[in-house]
Amino acid sequence: MKKLFATTLFLIAAIGLPTLGTAKNTSKNKAGGSSRPVAARIPVQGPAYATREDVMRWADDMASRRDLDRDWVRQAIGQAHFLPGVPRLMLPPPTGTAKNWRVYRSRFIDPIRIRAGVAFWQANRATLERAAKEYLVPVEIIVGIIGVETVYGQQMGSYRVIDALATLAFDFPASHPRAAARQEFFRGELEQFLSLSQRTGADPMTPVGSYAGAMGMPQFMPSSVVRYAVDFDGDGRIDLSSSPADVIGSVASYFKAFNWQPGMPTHYAVRFDPERLDKDALLAPDILPTFSVETFTAKGAVLDGVALSHKGPLALVELQNGDAPPSYVAGTENFYAITRYNWSSYYAMAVIELGREVAAAMPAASTVAR
C-alpha cells in the first residue's frame, strides 16, 4: 500500500490513549511487562529544554541539516521537558539478575490477553487474511505482535513523545554500557519525529506513547512510521492508534522488510548429545542464525523430523529459567526476524506463543459466537 503523509497523518499515527506502555515501550531487552490494562500514569516533568544551551545548539544544527524552520524547531524542542523517571528505565538489570522465561511468558500469555486477541482476530479477520496474503506473514505473528505490544490497543502509553525522546536524546544515562550509541539513536528518532511533525503540520506537543517514544498499537518508533507504516484501509492517511487495518498492514510490512520467509517455521525443538555437545560454540553467535543443519548437529544439537530437512541457517536460542535449567530451541531466520522488532529472544517466543494460543482459541470462540 502507498505511504501517505497527509496533513494530519503523523498526528493521527502518533496519538494513543493515555494508558501505560508494555514490554517494547519500556525496555527492549528486559524480560518483563504487564498483561493487564492499568490506569494511566502521568509522568513527572522536570525543566524545559529551552534552558539548555547545548540542546538549543543541537536544535539549530538539526534544523539546518533537515532544512526545517529554525524558529519552529527551537520552539518545539524548547517546550520539551526532561522526564526524571525515564533514564533509569533504560538501564539494564543489575549484574547477576537471573532471566526467567517462565515468568516472562506468564506476563504475556494469559487468559485476558488471549481473549482480547480472539476478539481482535474475529473483528479483523478479513483484513488479517488480506495482509497475510499480500505480505506473506502469518496472521498468528501479526496478532502476537499487537497483543504483546499493547494488548490490542489497550496499553499504548502515557508519555508525551517529545518529552520522552528529548530526555533520551540529551540525558541518556551515562552508566549504560552503550550510552553513546543509544543516545545517538534517540537523537535520530527525535529528528524524525520533528521532521514529520513540521512537514505534516502536526502539533509535536500532542502525541503520547511509551517512555521510549514508541507510538500507537504496534508501538512504532518515528523512524519505523516513516519506513514501514502503510495506509492499509485506503482512506488516505495512516492511523496507527485507531485503525486496526493500518496497524495490521504496517506490522506485516515491517516483517516483509526484515526478510520474513514464507512457510518457514520460526523454530524447532532441540535436544543435546552429551558426547558431542559444544554448547559454547553453538551459543557464540547469540540469536543470529549461523549454522547449517549439518554443522548444528555435528556440534551436538539433535534435531528431529522436519527440522532435519531445514534449508537455512539455525541458531541455538537459550531461554533461561531462573534457577531451573534453561530451555532451548533451534531458531530460524524467521525467529530472528521477530527479534528485529524487539531485540530479545524472550520477546520473540512470547509473540510466537501468544499468536498460537489465540489461534488455538479461535475455533471454540467461533462456536460460542454462533
Language-model features: locations:
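Bacterial N-terminal signal peptides that target proteins for export
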Residues: 1-8
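Bacterial N-terminal signal peptides
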Residues: 8-16
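Surface-exposed patches in mature extracellular/periplasmic domains of secreted proteins
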Residues: 68-77, 138-144, 204-209, 235-238, ...
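Acidic helix-start/capping segments at beta-turn-to-alpha-helix junctions
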Residues: 69-97, 146-150, 159-167, 269-277
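Acidic/His-rich structured neighborhood in mature extracellular/periplasmic domains
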Residues: 98-250, 256
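Ligand-binding pocket segment of bilobal, Venus flytrap-like solute-binding proteins
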Residues: 237-292
